[in-house]
Amino acid sequence: MSYVFRALPKILRNRPNAHIVVVGGDGASYGGPPPDGTTWKQRFIDEVRADISDTDWQRVHFTGLISYDKFISLLQVSRAHIYLTYPFVLSWSLLETMSAGGAILASDTAPVREVIFDDETGLLTDFFDTDALADNLNRLLDDAGLRSRLGAAARQLVLDRFDLEKTCLPQQLQWVDALAQTPAHP
């Protein structure tokens, strides 16, 4: 999240009508809290707030934790979804965004490259390059055809690979059947 925050001043300057919506709680979900007793969110805000005007800051919205239904509704009305993770597991939220046909700008990191193929199912950007993040977001927001094409391809990939009834459940049952037929070792 820190690199998204660091890109905010440029994003807000480049997109004077854009609203940025940040979904999630303030606590540390993966890893520990900051050593000074604050939250990561507050540390990131403190890092960039001086570079963002009060008027622009009013276009940054923090929802906190929201229900699944509200999350899906938000995905359906958003123009772009930024997903940055530095090698960690592939998140359900990315797959949900793909399923909703969202246009995705994601970090070019190992777990993400399993489903986001640059310029096919989304745009990939260097995790550490905040200028590239802002520039790639501009590219995505400037091109409705690109957003539509990437979103449709992302949705199709999720349907092909992760559909519960056609793909996941049959594979799981096959795995359980194979385990059941394996002889037990004394």
Indicate residue ranges for each PLM-predicted region.
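A short, well-ordered alpha-helix in the C-terminal region of glycosyltransferases
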Residues: A132, R139, L146-R161, T167, ...
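Short hydrophobic beta-strand element within catalytic cores of glycosyltransferases
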Residues: A103-A106
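Conserved acidic donor-binding segment of nucleotide-sugar-dependent glycosyltransferases
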Residues: D118-D119, L123-T130, R139-G145
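C-terminal alpha-helical cap of glycosyltransferases
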Residues: L164-P186
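Aromatic "clamp/platform" in nucleotide-sugar-dependent glycosyltransferases that forms part
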Residues: Y86
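Short alpha-helical donor nucleotide-sugar binding micro-motif in glycosyltransferases
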Residues: L65, S73-S78
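Short alpha-helical segment that forms part of, or immediately flanks, the ligand-binding pocket
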Residues: I72, S91-S99, R113-E114, E120
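Nucleotide-activated donor-binding/catalytic signature segment of Leloir-type glycosyltransferases, i.e.
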Residues: A28, P33-L65, D69
